[in-house]
Regions:
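Structural signal for interior beta-strand "rungs" in well-ordered beta-sheet cores
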Residues: 2-186
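SDR active-site lid
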Residues: 178, 184-197, 203
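Intrinsically disordered, low-complexity terminal regions
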Residues: 195-227
Length: 227
């Protein structure tokens, strides 16, 4: 259902069973897949490619022009996968000519006022707390949790199954399975719950990983783990 009070550009491609509420704005050069819901006052802007079963809440701006001085109006993209929840006032910028694309994977939960800047690559099944923000060209891999108010510096990588605690300024890369906290960011522990639940590791192995994280592994070595 598309409300007659919504604006949908005639050139936009809208899938089946899409609900677009009153006062939503759908720009030209937009593709929205099947079974998506666009709430009132949400804006889906030019260059956005959205998969299926996504919900975009009130006041979100999806596919906004990059906040980057080198951007000169190129035709760049924002690609969003399937089954994402994008809450109120989230802003996601499309790419610049460095990568041409900002990417959001599948099954992510972006809480109120999250900002993903240009050329950010967000993986699958991530949770980004209220007002968490990434600068340009960041990589946030699969199954990452960014607490509320986290700020990720330009170009940093937050690697799979890591957790960055509330209010942290992530000015360096975070290795996999690590809990990071403090300002400036520092090692806080390992994500033992995930190692136990998802990787089925024994307590002995988890203890060895914890010791290695403290004594034996620098960030550069740890980041060689595929994300």
């Amino acid at each position: 259902m598309i409300s007659p009070l919504a604006y949908v550009n005639p050139d936009a491609k809208i899938g089946k069973d899409v609900t677009i509420h009153p006062f939503a704005y759908i720009d030209k050069n937009v593709e929205i897949g099947d079974n998506c819901t666009i709430m009132p006052y949400a804006s889906i802007l030019s260059g956005t490619r959205m998969g299926t079963n996504n919900t975009v809440y009130q006041g979100a701006i999806i596919g906004a022009t990059p906040q980057d001085f080198k951007f000169k109006g190129e035709d760049t993209l924002l690609k969003i996968g399937n089954n994402n929840t994008i809450r109120e006032k989230v802003i996601i910028n499309r790419g610049t000519n460095t990568t041409d694309c900002t990417i959001v994977g599948n099954g992510n939960f972006l809480l109120e006022s999250v900002h993903l800047a240009h050329d950010t690559h967000l993986g699958n099944n991530c949770v980004l707390g209220n007002a968490a923000k990434t600068a340009g060209n960041c990589i946030v891999a699969d199954n990452v949790i960014l607490g509320s108010g986290v700020i990720v510096k330009h170009g940093c990588r937050i690697v799979t199954w890591s957790l960055v605690k509330d209010g942290c300024r992530a000015n360096k890369d975070v290795p996999p399975y690590i809990v990071a906290a403090h300002n400036p960011i520092a090692y806080y522990g390992i994500n033992a719950y995930i190692l136990r639940k998802e990787q089925k590791l024994t307590e002995e192995i988890i203890d060895d990983i914890a010791k290695a994280s403290v004594k034996c592994i620098n960030v550069g070595q740890a980041l060689k783990t595929p994300y």
